[in-house]
Amino acid sequence: MMKCLSLQSKMILYVAIGALFAFMGGIVYYSTLDIPELEKSEIELYSVEVIEVNNFENYISLKNTFLIKNFGEKTVTVPVISYEFFANGKFIGTSNFSAEDIPLTGRALLISGTEVPFTTKIKIDLTEENENEYMKIANGEHVDYSADGLYTIETAWQVIDVEFEN
């Protein structure tokens, strides 16, 4: 009788462990269902504003606004935007936006069908390589700005990095 009870206890333990692994696998599978929704976002360099031109220390501060659109059905957040910044096609610096230190519930929400602006600042130092673009920006001349980089977009279940160029 004791041997039979021991075998039954082992079977219950094995079934419980198997059920636990099946449950964990189901959670992983469910989380991957968000990936197509995360890929339905789009980022655009919306505006660039000159904040400060410091002729004494030879730098310019710019405020860049990125507009992120959510075309998916799920509500998402954007914790990180990292990018290289170009003026007239010439590299002039890098910058980033980060909300990683803010809990997921406190970040800007991109509800389905919405557009949300994210603002960053970039400091451009005068160098020999960027002198022409620097002077055009400082003098208020027309400059075509662009940015290439990576942004992270996430739901409560999944996180992906998306590359962008614009």
Language model features with spans:
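Intrinsically disordered, low-complexity Pro/Gly/Ser/Thr-rich segments with frequent PxxP/GP/PP motifs
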Residues: 89-130
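Short, solvent-exposed loop/turn segments enriched in Ser/Thr/Gly
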Residues: 58-65, 139
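Asparagine-centered strand-capping/turn motif at beta-strand->loop junctions
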Residues: 66-72
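Short, hydrophobic/aromatic beta-strand segments
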Residues: 74-82, 94-95
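Membrane engagement elements in two modes
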Residues: 1-57, 156-166
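Short structured motifs
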Residues: 46-52, 66, 101-106, 130-134
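Terminal connector regions
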Residues: 123-166
